[in-house]
A protein has these predicted regions:
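Short acidic, glycine/serine/threonine-rich loops at helix termini
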Residues: 23-27, 56-63, 130-133, 158-164, ...
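Glycine-enriched alpha-helix->loop->beta-strand junction motifs that scaffold or abut catalytic
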Residues: 114-118, 182
Length: 191
């Protein structure tokens, strides 16, 4: 235990466990020991919600049994989910949105404003009015709670992070050319 003092605890609250969300939880489960040993990150999933039910466990949800625990959980309630995350008040809390819900996307400001980081594959918040995106990024800076959305762009390729690193190293982006539709990109590359 003494040697684990440098391990950083991340507390995840996951909304949306369909195809993407369930794969995400499987990946967390599979990589948990690697992350702890090599990156000094201990990841605990504290809350999980789908559109019907939600479940919380202060000690961390057993990821080998999350589906049955969720099935036996309480009725899903987005405001109550947020209130529970807020009430638990864990350091290094991260809200993970694996939905395509506009209603969920509108809650990001509340999470970030309570110093809860947001990681999302939901495109809605970043594809709405630019002012909304700016507000979320400003809140993230003000409350030191990252707002991360890398999977929104380029079919999950690390485009945004790559651009940030290029700019940080002094490069100037003069022009970006892209096919912004995954479907059209497929057609152009195959026909």
């Amino acid at each position: 235990e003494f040697f684990e003092e440098n391990i950083k605890q991340l507390n995840l609250f996951v909304m949306g466990v369909g195809n993407v969300g369930s794969k995400f939880l499987a990946q967390v489960r599979q990589q948990r020991s690697y992350l702890k040993k090599n990156l000094k990150l201990n990841i605990r999933v504290i809350g999980i919600s789908n559109s019907r039910t939600m479940v919380f466990d202060d000690g961390g949800i057993a990821l080998d049994d999350w589906k049955s625990l969720l099935a036996d959980g309480q009725k899903a309630d987005k405001p109550k989910f947020f209130e529970t995350v807020q009430k638990l008040n864990y350091r290094n809390s991260i809200f993970v949105d694996n939905t395509a819900s506009e209603e969920v996307a509108t809650t990001y400001g509340s999470y970030i404003g309570n110093s809860i980081s947001v990681v999302t594959c939901n495109k809605i918040a970043c594809a709405s009015e630019f002012e909304n995106y700016q507000k979320l990024k400003n809140l993230a800076r003000e409350y030191n709670a990252p707002f991360l959305f890398e999977t929104n762009v380029g079919a999950g390729l690390p485009i945004i992070d790559t651009l940030k690193h290029l700019i940080a190293s002094g490069d100037k982006v003069l022009k970006i050319q892209a096919v912004l539709s995954g479907s059209l990109n497929f057609v152009f590359n195959n026909f």
